[in-house]
Amino acid sequence: MANHKSALKRIRQSAKRTVANRIDKARMRTFAKKVLAAVEAGDVELAQQTLRDATSVISRTAQRGVIHTNQASRRIARLNSHVKKLAVAAAS
């Protein structure tokens, strides 16, 4: 256990940030799962709508510094490719 006042404060701050970051990451994963569920169901309209929502949430998570911007871009790109494949298959 820390002995210095500043170290104790850092522990408190770190715990507080950890909780907030965990909530943000969980929210991001939930939105990504909604997109994938819509793709699995074959619903193009719902997939596109949930992709917009997920993109917003993922970008905000990166903006807050919870995840790296490259990771956010990669997640968005992968979700986007799933939705595009579905749209192309539905159009055919």
UniProtKB/Swiss-Prot annotation:
One of its GO terms (biological process) is translation. This is Small ribosomal subunit protein bS20. One of its GO terms (cellular component) is small ribosomal subunit. SUPFAM superfamilies: Ribosomal protein S20. It comes from the Bacteria. Binds directly to 16S ribosomal RNA. Pfam families: Ribosomal_S20p. NCBIfam families: S20. Belongs to the bacterial ribosomal protein bS20 family. Keywords: Ribonucleoprotein, Ribosomal protein, RNA-binding, rRNA-binding. GO terms for molecular function: small ribosomal subunit rRNA binding; structural constituent of ribosome. The keyword Methyltransferase does not apply.
